[in-house]
Amino acid sequence: VTIVCNFSQPAEGQPALLSADEAGTLFHEFGHGLHNLFKDVHYYGVSGVPRDFVELPSQIMEHWVFEPEVLKVYAKHYQTGEVIPAALIEKLDKSGKYGQGFATTEYLAASLLDMDFHILKDVHDGADVMMFENAVLGERGLLEQIPPRYRTTYFNHTMGGGYTAGYYSYIWAEVLDCDAYEAYKE
């Protein structure tokens, strides 16, 4: 199992430090790594894990990235070793909730677009994918100011990588991971 990430390079002479977003990405990808590590299959491609479930292990890991007990283990000043202050932990928690409606709308728009691409019956020569995208989103009443997570011209998930007509699994996994996390917290 490997985890490959594309994090920001440090300025010359500076240490490589992760932003809060990059730490979240690392925990997310680590969740995928754990999921793959604990599968009991010889060949990865035939693991039998439904697409609806595949994001759950990675997304549940995102809950722990800013847990105070976890932060105290890894979020330390790189020079002094001082643990992240409680006030900053509280600010991180609040900032993670900011813009959640915007993010959910981005994912929903991308999920609807993905589904509509895969129920197309007639596609004529010279079809304009951006016109199709605008029509799909307009029919659903989505705001132009909140575009899909990925625009059609660079939405790799929808045409490959195992997420064809399954991009909604990110939103569904969020429902499942929040429920599982709350059960853990109880």
Regions found by a protein language model. Name each.
Residues V1-E186:
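Cation-handling catalytic/transport regions enriched in His/Asp/Glu
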